[in-house]
């Protein structure tokens, strides 16, 4: 058993000394890596990752996502990756399903969703991805304002008469 625990710690980049630490002695990123090791300890084929990096800063997010990808390749497992951050989702997922108010509103491969979003909620999520290029900040702000305006003007068309999200319609 200890051999397996050491293997799992190594898999997520933690030293053997981590065995002797209390939970409060780990950073947030280390805790997420431990959670990842626990999730794959029994060698599952499928892991549900619900907002796995949402509370982490960007550099630590990248580390955890890299460990997740490496483990995915090593164990040939699939993730159901749940997140509001489509910038993170883009790095992790080949296929996406967008949910709004508890219903699927859009489904497609990564390229379809990112290059040609159909639902206004998808457009809003995409516009929330920070643009790090200072030369494009004004353009990004303008696009966000346009999407917000479209949302306010047309949101009713995305809802059924009872106020629920309409059915998912294939394109």
Where are these regions (language model features)?
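Conserved ABC ATPase "signature" region
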Residues: 2-17, 126
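ABC ATPase "signature
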Residues: 104-108
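A short, proline-enriched helix->beta-strand linker immediately N-terminal to the Walker B motif
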Residues: 41-45
């Amino acid at each position: 058993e200890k051999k397996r625990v050491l293997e799992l710690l190594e898999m997520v980049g933690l030293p053997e000394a981590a065995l002797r630490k209390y939970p409060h002695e780990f950073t947030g990123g280390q805790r997420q890596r431990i959670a990842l090791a626990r999730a794959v300890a029994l060698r599952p084929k499928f892991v549900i990752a619900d907002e796995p990096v949402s509370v982490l800063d960007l550099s630590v997010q990248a580390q955890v996502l890299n460990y997740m990808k490496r483990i995915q390749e090593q164990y040939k497992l699939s993730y159901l990756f749940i997140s509001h951050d489509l910038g993170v989702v883009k790095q992790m997922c080949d296929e996406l399903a967008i949910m709004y108010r508890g219903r699927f509103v859009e489904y497609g491969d990564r390229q379809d969703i990112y290059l040609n979003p159909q639902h206004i909620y998808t457009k809003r999520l995409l516009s929330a991805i920070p643009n790090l290029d200072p030369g494009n900040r004004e353009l990004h702000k303008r696009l966000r304002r346009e999407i917000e305006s479209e949302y306010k003007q047309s949101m009713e068309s995305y809802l059924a008469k009872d106020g629920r999200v309409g059915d998912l319609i294939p394109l």
